[in-house]
């Protein structure tokens, strides 16, 4: 079996690329697919301001190059000391990204504070190309018509803007139209989430394995239009990108053909080289998640508790926990264990766990049949 790998300049066994900190569970929205099952008010046990500063010190404890600290939620803007925490992190030289919700909290003053505090990137969610679809997912009538101006305001402020889209049965047909919105607004990154059944996402319609494959081929095509394309919980996108670069033809499925035709109609022929993101990170390898109460998990969608930053330094948890050693060992079962793309991809460990209770099982959303099967 020929193994397909991608060299990395960072040893992900020692240092993550991304540290996600869920600074609060509070959020004014009630999105159908919310990982956090967010609530209007903060939950008891949130890390205090002093504990938050201590966590920032722990992130710095990984050493340089520091991981990117992604402040998420809930809605990170509902945490009263959020910009004090941002200032503390940037003063240490830690790159900071923020993931606010589009609510009345996202004001021009808040955007100005992001710029002044040195925030490197901001991500917003866009889950449909129409008000009916997006608002249906977000649970707030009129939210789409608030989101588009918010995207433009962030771009106009000079911030790097990432748009997060969660793919599900109700919006998969609008992906080409969403790509058009991103191109028109000058967005830098499109991060496409594929459902894992945690939180409120348990009640949301996931697409099939074959549809996952066709969407990934579409996303490869979309990466030629001026914005970076990344995926969350679909590491097999990296396998698709590698195969396409090796000359594999696109599939002839109806979903792919429809999305591809929409892309050509809306944006014309591809005009740039692919900017698909293929860093071989996955849950617990290059990624670690700190919940609102300081509990540590391999990722936000993989609810395997690893310890608490209140009692153990984050770097020690990340480097030494046996669960993370297992995930990084690539001793996968099923198709993932036989796959020549295991290092580049590795499958969604979160989806494997959600489906089987075993984080080393095969990813049930992957349609690929490895050569060893």
Protein language model regions, located:
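Conserved residues at the C-terminal ends of beta-strands
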Residues: 21, 37, 72, 125, ...
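Short loop/turn motifs at secondary-structure junctions
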Residues: 30, 64-65, 118, 186-189, ...
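Conserved alpha-helical substructure of the radical SAM core
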Residues: 1-121
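Residues embedded in well-ordered beta-strands within globular domains across many folds
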Residues: 70, 123, 191, 230-233, ...
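Radical SAM enzyme [4Fe-4S]-AdoMet core and its adjacent flexible, acidic
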Residues: 115-117, 125-127, 132-281, 292
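Accessory C-terminal segments flanking Radical SAM cores
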Residues: 235-372
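A generic "binding-loop/recognition-motif" signal
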Residues: 27, 102, 130, 302-305, ...
């Amino acid at each position: 079996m020929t193994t397909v790998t991608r060299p990395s300049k960072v040893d992900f066994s020692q240092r993550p690329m991304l540290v996600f900190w869920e600074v609060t569970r509070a959020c004014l929205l009630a999105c159908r697919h919310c990982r956090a099952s967010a609530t209007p008010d903060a939950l008891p046990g949130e890390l205090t301001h002093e504990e938050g500063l201590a966590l920032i010190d722990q992130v710095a404890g990984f050493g340089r190059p520091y991981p990117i600290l992604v402040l998420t939620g809930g809605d990170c803007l509902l945490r009263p000391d959020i910009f004090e925490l941002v200032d503390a992190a940037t003063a240490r030289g830690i790159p900071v990204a923020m993931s606010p919700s589009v609510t009345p909290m996202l004001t021009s003053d808040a955007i100005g504070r992001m710029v002044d505090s040195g925030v490197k990137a901001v991500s917003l969610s866009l889950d449909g190309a129409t008000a009916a679809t997006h608002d249906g997912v977000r649970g707030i009538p009129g939210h789409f018509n608030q989101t588009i101006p918010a995207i433009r305001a962030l771009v106009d402020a000079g911030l790097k803007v990432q748009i997060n889209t969660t793919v599900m049965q109700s919006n998969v047909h609008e992906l080409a139209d969403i790509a058009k919105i991103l191109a028109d607004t000058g967005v830098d990154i499109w991060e496409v989430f594929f459902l894992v059944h945690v939180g409120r996402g348990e009640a949301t319609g996931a697409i099939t394995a074959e549809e996952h494959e066709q969407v990934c081929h579409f996303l490869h095509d979309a990466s030629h239009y001026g914005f970076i394309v990344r995926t969350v919980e679909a590491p097999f996108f990296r396998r698709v990108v590698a195969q396409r670069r090796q000359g594999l033809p696109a599939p002839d499925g109806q979903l792919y053909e429809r999305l591809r035709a929409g892309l050509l109609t809306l944006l014309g022929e591809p005009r740039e080289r692919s900017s698909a993101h293929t860093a071989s990170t996955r849950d617990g390898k290059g990624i670690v998640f700190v919940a609102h109460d300081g509990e540590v998990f391999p990722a936000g969608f993989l609810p395997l508790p690893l310890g608490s930053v209140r009692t153990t330094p984050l770097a020690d948890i990340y480097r030494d926990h046996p669960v993370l050693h297992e995930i990084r060992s690539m001793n996968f079962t099923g198709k993932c264990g036989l796959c020549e793309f295991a290092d580049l991809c590795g499958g969604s460990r979160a989806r494997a766990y959600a489906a089987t209770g075993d984080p080393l099982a095969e990813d049930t959303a992957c349609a690929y049949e490895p050569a060893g099967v």
